[in-house]
Amino acid sequence: MGIRENEHRAANLRFNGKEIQLAVKMLDELETTIDIIYYLMEQEKEQSFVLMLLTAQGVDLNTLLNKEKRETDILFEIDKEESLYVMLCQDTKVDGGYRFAERVIRNIQLDEGKDIFCTELEVRATHYSAKHVILKLLETFVKSRLTDKSNEIVFRSLN
């Protein structure tokens, strides 16, 4: 059976129904935590942070991420069935976030995981709303999947 005409994505449509549901889950899970991190940044107790959105199949991603994370990192299980997780890494800049993602992807591959998609977003300032940050992370992730950037780290910064 072929694709119905209305099932084709319009060029200006960013999220399909499933991705909007995912956005709602991510907003519910992350928004308050990012607001707290923003408070710490404004009090000069934090400088920047990195959000990593990661999925992989054929590996226990929850266990692997819990083993790799630092005490200050916060792990969020967004969708257990889809093996989709967000890690918030406090006091982390581009280099640290990228190296962490490299290590995680290498360990996923060693455990014979597949279909690995990893997007990271560095946040250096508090002038973006938490909602904007979360939706930008998801938008970047969706684009990385559409362009088949499997086994790559797609990294963006918000200044």
Which residues fall in each region the model found?
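Regulatory and interdomain segments flanking nucleotide-handling catalytic cores
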Residues: 1-159
